[in-house]
Amino acid sequence: MILLVNLFVLLSVVCVLLNLAGFILGCQGAQFVSSVPRCDLVDLGEGKICFCCEEFQPAKCTDKENALKLFPVQPCSAVHLLLKKVLFALCALNALTTTVCLVAAALRYLQIFATRRSCIDESQISAEEAEDHGRIPDPDDFVPPVPPPSYFATFYSCTPRMNRRMVGPDVIPLPHIYGARIKGVEVFCPLDPPPPYEAVVSQMDQEQGSSFQMSEGSEAAVIPLDLGCTQVTQDGDIPNIPAEENASTSTPSSTLVRPIRSRRALPPLRTRSKSDPVLHPSEERAAPVLSCEAATQTERRLDLAAVTLRRGLRSRASRCRPRSLIDYKSYMDTKLLVARFLEQSSCTMTPDIHELVENIKSVLKSDEEHMEEAITSASFLEQIMAPLQPSTSRAHKLPSRRQPGLLHLQSCGDLHTFTPAGRPRAERRPRRVEAERPHSLIGVIRETVL
């Protein structure tokens, strides 16, 4: 870079000097031609020439330095005038060239000086920064950075606006329960669907569980069979349970569950279609094998035949029936959330939120009606069969299609699909009913309908 700068400086100086010399010489020649007033044609021995002299008489122009000789291509006056014009043009052109060279050199020098000055300033600034880094920063001069935007703003931007402080930490908000679109209000569904029914049944086929026997007599006590199954009192009140547990039907308070000493392996399951329950045939006539759901739904007296319950080795999630779209925990959370909404004035709600609350309220009412209907039917059948005292020796094995074995339903809503329409027929045949009485609430209702 320095070599190029030096070369430019040298060329600029040479160009300016040459143009200046040409300007000076051109001006001198033009001045000399202008000083010669006239030119005469003189015949010399070699030929004719135009002889120009300062004097009016050519004889007096003996000095060659003061005389101008021109070849007569044209008349002498025309040649003299043309030479004069050429010299003046050359002088003006040299002057213009000298000016351009001076301006170009000056601009280049200014640019070089400005660049060097900026470099000097930068070096000074860097030195000052180094000195600043060496000093300890003042805490008062610190400016905190702007916090980044919330990562969850886009997730809640499409969901209905609600005051999240009014909802407890154990309450599931509405968008996570109902996956639908109500008047342009977009809500979300749970990301993890329940496992398929066939996968649960196929996994249960590969396991063998221990046995439990429901004995007769003794005081009223209930031992929980599994974490996935809970009891429901006869009055129809459903206790609060964790989100992982599923609700079952009622168990009488006079039932006692005791572990049996002898254990045996259970036969493999027989898989049927989705619309038909999966039945586990029992090898003993007086002790049919029941699942966790069927055992908790059984309403029997202490003096009936013993019921053997199977307790598996798998986790609690796969022992109970597959979960429905809205499980009991979400159901209770929704009731609590709707109750909190109803505590507020309807004037403060938007029309969309008000209509959403009304829709959920109607759904909850329908579910309560179905649950109350099932509990009422079970209580009614229990009152009918209470006076009956069946003997364990009279129990016999039912056909495979009518045997009340392990019942796995598609959802909790299957309870209200059975109605006690055959109650008079059950009253007309009390002895046969007590001999063939099934061991689950759903089996009782189904047998009554048939």
Swiss-Prot record:
MF-aspect GO terms: ubiquitin ligase activator activity
Region called Mediates interaction with EPN1, residue ranges: 107-450
Tissue specificity annotation: Prominently expressed in muscle.
Principal location: membrane
Record topology, Cytoplasmic segments: 107-450
Region Disordered, residue ranges: 235-284
Cellular component, GO annotation: early endosome membrane; late endosome membrane; plasma membrane; recycling endosome membrane
Modified residues (Phosphoserine): S275
Membrane topology: Single-pass type I membrane protein
Keywords, alphabetical: Cell membrane, Endosome, Isopeptide bond, Membrane, Phosphoprotein, Signal, Transmembrane, Transmembrane helix, Ubl conjugation
Membrane-spanning parts: 86-106
InterPro entries on file: ENTREP1-3
Source domain of life: Eukaryota
Feature: compositional bias, Basic and acidic residues: 273-284
Placement of sequence motif PPxY: 148-151, 194-197
Feature: compositional bias, Polar residues: 246-256
Signal sequence segment: 1-29
Compartments it resides in: Early endosome membrane; Late endosome membrane; Recycling endosome membrane; Cell membrane
Linked residues for Glycyl lysine isopeptide (Lys-Gly) (interchain with G-Cter in ubiquitin): K274, K329, K365
PTM: Monoubiquitinated at Lys-274, Lys-329 and Lys-365 by ITCH.
Gene Ontology biological process: CXCL12-activated CXCR4 signaling pathway; negative adaptation of signaling pathway; receptor internalization
Sequence similarity: Belongs to the ENTREP family.
Classification via PANTHER family: ENDOSOMAL TRANSMEMBRANE EPSIN INTERACTOR 1 (PTHR17615:SF8), PROTEIN FAM189A (PTHR17615)
Physiological role: Functions as an activator of the E3 ubiquitin protein ligase ITCH in the ubiquitination of the CXCL12-activated CXCR4 receptor. Thereby, triggers CXCR4 endocytosis and desensitization, negatively regulating the CXCL12/CXCR4 signaling pathway.
Entry note about domains: The cytoplasmic PPxY motifs mediate interaction with the WW domains of ITCH.
Protein name: Endosomal transmembrane epsin interactor 1
Record organism: Homo sapiens
Protein's gene: ENTREP1
